[in-house]
Design a protein with these regions (language model features):
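N-terminal pre-triad scaffold of radical SAM enzymes
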Residues: 33-74, 81-105
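Canonical radical SAM enzyme core domain
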Residues: 77-90, 113-158, 163-167, 181, ...
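Auxiliary Fe-S-binding modules of radical SAM enzymes
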Residues: 1-30, 219-225
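Conserved, mostly hydrophobic/aromatic
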Residues: 12, 36, 65, 106, ...
């Protein structure tokens, strides 16, 4: 079964949910890992990009995601600040560029970054692009298309928005927003030409079927990273 499904994927096919469940129950895990490695080698090779982030806004988040220390609803003793200053941001970007990092991402806490702070980030981005070859990314919550377009115009070409878990399990982990909210942001970013990276967190009590459903939704959305 493993070899048959491997060849199916290598020849351009896609496995079904039922086939994925069968693979997850395979007794010979080493054979499964080898098959996955062959698919990886053909599809993406063994090179990877390096992506560094700046925690550009920390804490004070209104959302109730159980896994996240940024939520204002939990006592985590993290440092809280509204937005980093320009010098801190530019210095860190320059340092990462000097180390050969490929991508630099602005990551902010909160359901969605405010328009005022988006404008400030855009100012930072324009200056970073003028001083380096870094590809700029952002993870700023549930932004709308017009806000994403501002980022794109400033040189931020990739947006990150994790689905975190399957649609069925997500409500166990977070009730202040939904998978549909996340998908709306992902599709808005794609519609204006942004690259999108998305994924999830493994080990929060979800089942193997939840992990498979998460992977299938990422595939449906055309996520490559």
């Amino acid at each position: 079964m493993i070899t048959q499904l491997k060849e199916k994927v290598l020849n351009g096919g896609q496995i079904t949910r039922e086939e994925a469940i069968l693979l997850s129950n395979a007794v010979d895990k080493q054979a499964l890992y080898r098959a996955a490695g062959e698919i990886r080698d053909k599809r993406v090779g063994r090179r990877f990009d390096t992506c560094s982030i700046i925690n550009a806004r920390s804490g004070r988040c209104s959302e109730n995601c159980k896994w996240c220390a940024q939520s204002a609803l939990f006592k985590t003793n993290i440092e809280e600040y509204e937005l980093v200053d320009e010098k801190t941001c530019l210095d860190l970007a320059r340092s990462n560029a000097d180390y050969g990092v490929d991508k630099f991402s602005f990551v902010t806490s909160g359901r969605a970054l405010s328009d005022k702070n988006i404008d400030r980030i855009c100012t930072f981005a324009v200056k970073i692009k003028s001083q380096s070859d870094l590809q700029l990314c952002a993870s700023m919550g549930l932004l709308k298309k017009a806000q994403l377009q501002k980022l794109m115009d400033a040189g931020i070409t990739r947006y990150h928005c994790n689905l975190e878990s399957s649609a069925d399990y997500f409500g166990t982990l977070c009730t202040s927003h939904t998978p549909a909210d996340k998908i709306e942001t992902i599709r808005a970013a794609q519609e204006i030409g942004m690259e999108v990276c998305s994924g999830g967190i493994i080990g929060m009590g979800e089942s193997m079927e939840d992990r498979i459903d998460l992977a299938l939704m990422l595939r449906e959305l055309g996520i490559k990273s």
